[in-house]
Amino acid sequence: MSTYTIPNVIAQHPRGGERITDIYSHLLAERIVYLGTPIDSGVANALIAQLLHLESESPDQEINFYINCEGGDLPSMLAVYDTMQHIGAPVHTTCVGQAIAVGAVLLAGGAPGQRAMLPHARVVLHQPAARGQGPIPDLILQADELVRMRSEIEAILSRHTGRSPEQLREDTDRDRVFTATAALEYGLIDTVLSPRG
């Protein structure tokens, strides 16, 4: 686990003077949401709160969601995904580093025509994994839930990529790594961003 300091930015206040805020608050004021960690329930709650806040401020204005995610908890990701699909504001998604597993679902779930990757970013699709702890009846329940959730993820990705659930199942039996160009061809994104300038 890395430790780092969250940077502060200095912004000019409209009535004169300066205001110091953390970088995430500054980005939020610009309608930018950034996911830079694996997803757990705490991260999901923060993302959902930001999406709901931005939608309440301006329900028709786009939200830019930047993703650099190593994966995470499926139910937590589904809560964020469902919120993205529920709100009226279109969510433009951009992968800036990697979108692994649950991060890939969020990337693909962006507004149609508004899903992008930087040229050296990558997407990894793979099947969900179980924890495998507890008594046998609990393990059976976990396995059943895993099968159900895998089907849900395949249906979601099918809806956003145009690929069949059967093809997605076959393609995710093992880790499948996509470059930006390969993700575009597969239907996970709509564009590969070019360097500015």
Swiss-Prot record:
Tell me any Pfam family this protein matches: CLP_protease
- EC number(s) on record? 3.4.21.92
Where primarily located? cytoplasm
Instruction: List the CDD domains hit by this protein, alphabetically.
Output: S14_ClpP_2
The superkingdom of the source organism is Bacteria
Tell me the active site: H126
Biological process (GO) annotations?
A: protein quality control for misfolded or incompletely synthesized proteins
Cellular component, GO annotation: cytoplasm; endopeptidase Clp complex
Q: Does the keyword Cytoplasm apply?
A: yes
The yes or no answer to whether the keyword Transcription is present is no
Compartments reported by the entry: Cytoplasm
One GO MF term, please? ATP-dependent peptidase activity
Q: Which residues form a coiled coil?
A: none
Which keywords describe this protein according to UniProt? Cytoplasm, Hydrolase, Protease, Serine protease
From the UniProt record, list the reaction(s) this protein catalyses: Hydrolysis of proteins to small peptides in the presence of ATP and magnesium. alpha-casein is the usual test substrate. In the absence of ATP, only oligopeptides shorter than five residues are hydrolyzed (such as succinyl-Leu-Tyr-|-NHMec, and Leu-Tyr-Leu-|-Tyr-Trp, in which cleavage of the -Tyr-|-Leu- and -Tyr-|-Trp bonds also occurs)
Record function comment = Cleaves peptides in various proteins in a process that requires ATP hydrolysis. Has a chymotrypsin-like activity. Plays a major role in the degradation of misfolded proteins.
Q: How does it assemble?
A: Fourteen ClpP subunits assemble into 2 heptameric rings which stack back to back to give a disk-like structure with a central cavity, resembling the structure of eukaryotic proteasomes.
Xref: PANTHER family: ATP-DEPENDENT CLP PROTEASE PROTEOLYTIC SUBUNIT, ATP-DEPENDENT CLP PROTEASE PROTEOLYTIC SUBUNIT-LIKE-RELATED
Protein family: Belongs to the peptidase S14 family.
What is the name of this protein? ATP-dependent Clp protease proteolytic subunit 1
Q: Which organism is it from?
A: Nocardia farcinica (strain IFM 10152)
According to the entry, what is the taxonomic lineage of the organism?
Bacteria, Bacillati, Actinomycetota, Actinomycetes, Mycobacteriales
GN (gene name): clpP1
